[in-house]
């Protein structure tokens, strides 16, 4: 039952997840940094006016309190797939897109988000900017992690979550060896 629950979606893209949780009764704060995705998101909201009343679309990134440079592909084949302010996943064919950024703690204060029932993150390494302070008053987290920069480690992310009272379950994205968990996957974390 998601009635009167608060969902924060970091990396909302076209808005499908916010629309789903709004249809289940939740109020959703949806952060999408990329202009192209945000325009599609707003279009989807306009096609669902009743549900859109429960969704607060925010054209910003979560990670750091500053203007962020996102690496975005310049060719149509890759579009905005895997765009990130943390790592260049685009190779040589990229451009920068400047985006307003907030630490999660700062965004919670700015948008008056006191308690989060579910934090959903799909943000291409921005999950590694989470802090102990960010994780206060959160019940559940579903995050997709991707590790491209070797300075980030899955164990560090799991330690942060466990230190803050979360029980974690890792789910692989595909049928690959367990070693692939170190590179990419999903973490489902529940406050215990």
Q: Model features per residue range: what roles?
A:
Residues 1-192:
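Phosphate/nucleotide-binding beta-alpha loop and adjacent structural elements of enzyme active sites
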């Amino acid at each position: 039952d998601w009635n009167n629950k608060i969902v924060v979606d970091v990396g909302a893209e076209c808005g499908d997840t916010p629309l789903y949780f709004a249809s289940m009764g939740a109020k959703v704060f949806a952060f999408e940094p990329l202009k192209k995705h945000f325009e599609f998101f707003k279009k989807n909201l306009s096609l669902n006016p009743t549900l859109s009343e429960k969704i607060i679309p925010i054209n910003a990134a979560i990670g750091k309190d500053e203007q962020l440079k996102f690496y975005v592909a310049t060719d149509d084949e890759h579009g905005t797939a895997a765009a990130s302010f943390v790592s260049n996943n685009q190779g040589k064919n990229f451009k920068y897109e400047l985006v307003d950024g907030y630490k999660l703690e700062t965004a919670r204060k700015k948008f008056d988000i006191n308690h989060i029932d579910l934090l959903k993150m799909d943000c291409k390494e921005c999950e590694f900017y989470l802090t102990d302070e960010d994780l206060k008053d959160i019940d559940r987290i579903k995050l997709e992690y991707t590790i491209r920069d070797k300075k980030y480690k899955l164990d560090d992310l799991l330690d942060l979550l466990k230190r803050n009272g979360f029980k974690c379950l890792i789910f692989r994205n595909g049928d690959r060896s367990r070693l692939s968990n170190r590179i990419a996957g999903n973490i489902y974390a529940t406050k215990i």
